[in-house]
Amino acid sequence: LSSEVIKTIDNRRALYVAALLHDVAKGRDEDHSVVGARIATELGPRFGLTSSETETAAWLIEQHLTMSLFAQSRDLNDPKTIRDFAAIVQSRERLKLLLVLTVCDIAAVGPGTWTGWKGQLLRTLYYEVEPLLGGGHTELTRSQRLQCAQSALRERLADWSDAEFDQFVGRHYPAYWIRTDLDVIAEHAELMRSAEQQKSVIVTHISTDAFRGVTQLTLLAPNHPWLLAMVAGACTGAGANIVDAQISTTRDGMALDTIHIQREFDHAEDEERRARKIASSIERMLLGEADVVDVIKAKVLSTARLSAFSVQPQVIIDNTLSDALTVIEINALDRPGLLYEVTREISNLNLDIASAHIATFGEKAVDVFYVTDLTGKKIASSSREALIRERLTRVLVETQEPELEVS
């Protein structure tokens, strides 16, 4: 996308200066994006930029991490995410410039840093925001969006009987239709129909995507408060990194989770073998045949390799980033087992996770969770927020050392 977009940018002078200077202030105590923008404001005229070009270059430098953070750490199915990003960018031209700079910045870090998954996230954000900036986008009401999603699915599942389709629709809450991509809903529908026909209680489906660099694991199982923690533990035990998780619960008490795992192997057969191992571990845990701590303990102890690094643990709770959900952001030293520890504690705090977005920046993990309380509402109490922050911070501090707490 970026290679096509750059051809449509009439004036690239500000982009080139931003690419040159975007990290010039790294290593300073102050935010390097802010300092870099000030430096660009001073140097722009000396580089021959006009005042308008200088302003654009400074803006690009100040915002050069924003698109990556939104794409990797926010729920792109949440309209509030798209509105917030559009408010920052404000014009299509700036959106184009920021996309190109973001792609260059990620790809220049080093081999393996750029992945198809990151590219897909950036493309999704770009295409969602572009109509909003063009003035041609009219936001639908919640009920209209729900009806559009169900109508589109009915066309997709043309071979289904009305009774089958109505049964599937009736199993899901309204939020599912609004937050979930149509392709994913169609996959879920086929999976749930297959489970119904086979009388299966626990069903998994695996698909690999070499272009995006991910393997998708879809899990249908009886809802369990620790289910995502079990999934995280199984992935840790198999040496797999979760990059995204969408969690849904049906009206009849089933969990329907779509997990994206970072691709490691060149051949699909190897990816599928690892995914089957993960699925088997999850099923054994749900059936009480395996303990999650035993599954991940050997992996955690054998990879205690990050003690030389230090990242200040941080827990941020924000009720402004989503209209319906509370957003919890975790910043900590990345290590095997971290996601398991955090998701387990979130479950212990009686919070429901609607989606999880997992990113790593060097040795730093940035895990973002969209959550509600058990009634499906945002976390509204300041004392409740304080307790959540305290408990999660304690987990992060304790897990700086490679040791598992068994409970």
Residue ranges of model-derived segments:
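Divalent metal-dependent catalytic cores for phosphoryl transfer on phosphate-bearing substrates
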Residues: 2-135
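Regulatory modules associated with amino-acid/nitrogen control
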Residues: 80, 84-407
